[in-house]
Amino acid sequence: KVTEKNIVEYYSHVMHIVSNVIGKFNNKFSIFETLLSGFPAGTVSGAPKIRAMEIIDELEKNKRKLYAGGIGYFTPNNEFDTCIALRTALIKNNKFYVQAGAGIVADSEPDKEYAETINKAKALMKAVD
């Protein structure tokens, strides 16, 4: 059930459209199978999903790793809450790693998509500046 749809959330460098979805757990599947069935999220892979993922693999120089993956928690009552790791940085060996992207579609304007990607990364870069 969609409890909230197309809510605009404003952040320091970007805006996001957010929807909240709740549902009943089907005991036919484990909680982990249920969660994994939604990844990678279509909002960051594209459609059709399998071909879009193949193109991403062909074109992107770096693997996504944490970026666009899932972060969340499980409760003892089989509830879970997750999000997609988009505004996330990784600090490893004293280096700060940031990945950002934009939703490329048929009528995308490359300059605008590039600017959007830079704006998304700026919030994290500012945090360590």
Residue ranges and their predicted role:
Residues 10-129:
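Conserved hydrophobic core element of enzyme catalytic domains
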Residues 1-6:
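Metal-dependent catalytic core segments for phosphate chemistry
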